[in-house]
Amino acid sequence: MTTADAQDPEFRFLPGDALRAGRTAPLPPVTRVSASVGEGRRLSGLSFDTPAAPRIVALHGAGLNAHSFDPFLLALGAPALALDLPGHGRSDWRADGDYRPDHLADDVATALEALAPEPVVLLGHSLGGLTAALVAAAQPERVRALVIVDITPGLSPARDAGAVTEFIRGQRSFADVAEAVDRAIAFGIGSDRAALTRGVTLNTRTRADGRLEWTHHLAHLDAPATGADPAGEDPQPYAPIWASLQTVTAPILLVRASSGMVSDALAKEWREQLPEATIREVSGPHNLHEAAPVALAEAVASLLATAPDRT
């Protein structure tokens, strides 16, 4: 295990994250943890407020990592676990390069058995949201409530997420952090240079030739398998997940970003498919947990406090 230390490069952004989150209390203990998920692979994550059992588990989107939740979890202030999805952050890459939600869900469910012994609020952003939906459907006893951030099973990658897909699959190396930040801004990933610099720094590594490359596996695959079909032959590859969501008995909250991926049409479809679920809109772009951590924490806090226990 590695515990947060201001001198450790991995955790050097935490004091600034706390300021952005409006946190005045001392930083909680943050520990790097991991669990075996089979095939010789391990899933890595960050445990906040160790050694308390997590009350919320967070799953990031494609091309991100557990550290993307640091500002949000500091704002929320609850014991938490943020996982690096397979092929991301410090989690091992899949030999088959297959990062579809169903494969991710199997690994996440296995990791939760080891790292989250009590039922949790399960939150997933983007690809992590689809993954969380499948985990909640398959293991209802482990999930007190489900929060999905800015994605629905009705999303069409070609129509709704083309810029993000191209950003992940496009340029693979950079002269420095500034060049990667410039590309992120150009693709509408964000506009706050300081926040983007933090994110890029925590999501890149230096190659032998001195150039930077992304740490996640998706940037190293010619056709990363996330369920999205770049040829557009399956315009709604995630649609079968609606059926899984309809079996979830825990409360479900969709948090929609005001300038994100969930269009009015997708929000309407959500209401038709899941009339008992709740929708809240938060001002900000797709990566709300990075761009609007306090507002997202406010949207989630009441559900965290009121979600029914699982016995």
How does the language model describe each region?
Residues 1-54, 77-78, 118, 301, ...:
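Alpha/beta-hydrolase fold catalytic core
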Residues 38-41, 46, 74, 85-123, ...:
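Active-site loop/oxyanion-hole signature of alpha/beta-hydrolase fold enzymes
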Residues 118-159:
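Conserved hydrolase catalytic core segment
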Residues 175-228:
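Conserved alpha/beta-hydrolase catalytic His-Asp/Glu region
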Residues 208-272:
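Conserved serine/cysteine hydrolase catalytic core
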Residues 273-286:
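Catalytic histidine neighborhood in serine/cysteine hydrolases
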Residues 284-297:
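Catalytic histidine-centered segment of alpha/beta-hydrolase-like enzymes
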